[in-house]
Amino acid sequence: MSGWYHSAHASDSLSKSPENWMSKLDDGKHLTEINIPGSHDSGSFTLKDPVKSVWAKTQDKDYLTQMKSGVRFFDIRGRASADNMISVHHGMVYLHHELGKFLDDAKYYLSAYPNETIVMSMKKDYDSDSKVTKTFEEIFREYYYNNPQYQNLFYTGSNANPTLKETKGKIVLFNRMGGTYIKSGYGADTSGIQWADNATFETKINNGSLNLKVQDEYKDYYDKKVEAVKNLLAKAKTDSNKDNVYVNFLSVASGGSAFNSTYNYASHINPEIAKTIKANGKARTGWLIVDYAGYTWPGYDDIVSEIIDSNK
């Protein structure tokens, strides 16, 4: 038996082994039924410039450390910097590494922990270099997705809503690149995912077979953002439909000063939402995408751990 209300192996302390917490779940669960912690602009940990960091740095741990801390959804954004290369970006800011760095780390991690699954969101976040002649999606598909170096790394099955058993040891693509020739993962259809800007919205994906429910109100201030996150959490809590995909962003755009930096917002939002998740107990949350994933503020609950432990 699979489904949200049953798990053969989940315990109260999944987060005690964050490096392999998925291995303790019923592998008949669909990924949409699993509460998954994610990191927003996952590659921004490389930023050292103090000015750029105020608004563009959203993580302080590298990919492997995020994975070991339990993060399983990675928000990767890029720029086509050559006809055979995607550079990782946060908007216009180059994050000093290429997409291959993430894929190499994911490949290494999944070989060490073959019962885990990684969901990778892929999005073009800045204009291509003037010399580039191919589309962003074409470069991704030809030089990464179909690259023999990453053979068997990506989930390539036909199930629009795969189970953990089907995706163990693999990356499942969450496609924000627009229309695509890639026929597996979330957003695998010719129209791709139609993403509303600064909004809470619903849209059909995978040729109408899945309902994507998103909260991504990144221009909100603290109170309104917390309210938006909690509203989607409340909907997920009472929803047992496995074909509904909940993606809830806790991130807020920086105002450009230390007072309203991404770090400062996260220091307030993450503990508040962690408290809500803890109070809800074993309940569906969906996928929560956070800034400073794995960072714990003294005296407060760790949001990644609370998301993991909320799984049944």
From Swiss-Prot:
Known role: Cleaves glycosylphosphatidylinositol (GPI) and phosphatidylinositol (PI) anchors but not PI phosphates. Potential virulence factor.
Bilayer-spanning residue ranges: none
EC numbers on record: 4.6.1.13
Active site: H40 (proton acceptor), H90 (proton donor)
GO cellular component: extracellular region
Top-level taxon of the source organism: Bacteria
Secretion signal span: 1-26
Occurrences of domain PI-PLC X-box (ranges): 27-176
Lineage, broadest ranks: Bacteria, Bacillati, Bacillota, Bacilli, Bacillales
Name of the protein this chain belongs to: 1-phosphatidylinositol phosphodiesterase
Reaction catalysis annotation: a 1,2-diacyl-sn-glycero-3-phospho-(1D-myo-inositol) = 1D-myo-inositol 1,2-cyclic phosphate + a 1,2-diacyl-sn-glycerol
Single GO term (MF): phosphatidylinositol diacylglycerol-lyase activity
Subcellular location: Secreted
InterPro entries the UniProt entry points to: PI-PLC_domain, PLC-like_Pdiesterase_TIM-brl, PLipase_C_PInositol-sp_X_dom
A biological process term (GO) from this entry: lipid catabolic process
UniProt keywords, alphabetically: Lipid degradation, Lipid metabolism, Lyase, Secreted, Signal, Virulence
